[in-house]
Amino acid sequence: MSRALRLRVFAGPNGSGKTTIIDAVRKARVNGRQVDFGVYINADEIAKALKKGYDLSPFELELGSVRFLAFAESSGLVDKELTLEQLADGVLWGAHRVRSKPALPKDRVAQLIAQFLYDELLNAKRKFSFETVFSHPNKLDLMKRAKAAGYKVYLYFVSTEDPAINVQRVKDIRVKQGGHDVPKEKIISRWSRTMANLPEALSIAYHAYLWDNSKHGSAQLFCEVKRAGNRATWNIQAELVPIWFLPYLLVPQEDGNKLSDIYVKAMKRYHGLEDA
């Protein structure tokens, strides 16, 4: 088994279809083998399990209240609504399980536990993967830290052309299937912040894949980029490029290449023009 360090980040706004992409990647074969996710973390799954207890045994780490509270205090994620004292009293760590008292906001506690687990896995040099809305810059910081620590960082990003699509999906699909609701205003504001974080994420990732899922049930992989040092190799399926990606074609690249030129060449190839 390969000991190479890998971090896999599945990112995209609420309701974009990250679960669909994760399922597809799990089923994929690379050189005849399944993709190695390492330890997989999903804050939503942590939140659902907190009442009875979230299983920590897959992590094979020495975790506990002291380390968790030290992380929480330095994280900047505690405030007047979720204090260090509340966490000390309400988050209960066992040998292989962590649970939370009902009085604590389970989604916020789950996010904090997830962040703690990322940090511990990174420090332990373990392979891991996680799912994120990607609206907060701390995920970019995590990717940078992983890259500096010798990880190959893989980014799997999916979005839609309009946050209204995401709002409707969360309402119609996730809630009806037992998923948690997210306020409309949050979905829209997160969509914008997530999209703003994409260019930097692409500059950090060793290998990135981008899907458009504007039409539900037909996610299209339209772009793949792989980096070697400061040089990037882009594979753009020009005929599939969605409207939401067009502004990124104008973002300057570290190696001096212009994505707009790469896009034009890809479009010419698609149409069979000689100078492509």
Identify the residue ranges that each predicted region occupies:
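The conserved Walker
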Residues: P13-N14
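Small-molecule kinase domains that catalyze NTP-dependent phosphoryl transfer to phosphate-bearing small molecules
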Residues: D181-V225
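A glycine- and Lys/Arg-enriched "phosphate-lid" helix/loop adjacent to the NTP-binding pocket
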Residues: A148-N197
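Short hydrophobic/aromatic beta-strand immediately N-terminal to the Walker A/P-loop
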Residues: L7-V9
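Conserved substrate/cofactor phosphate-moiety recognition/catalytic segment
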Residues: R26-N123
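C-terminal accessory extensions appended to soluble enzyme cores
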Residues: L210, K215-A276
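Walker A/P-loop
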Residues: T19
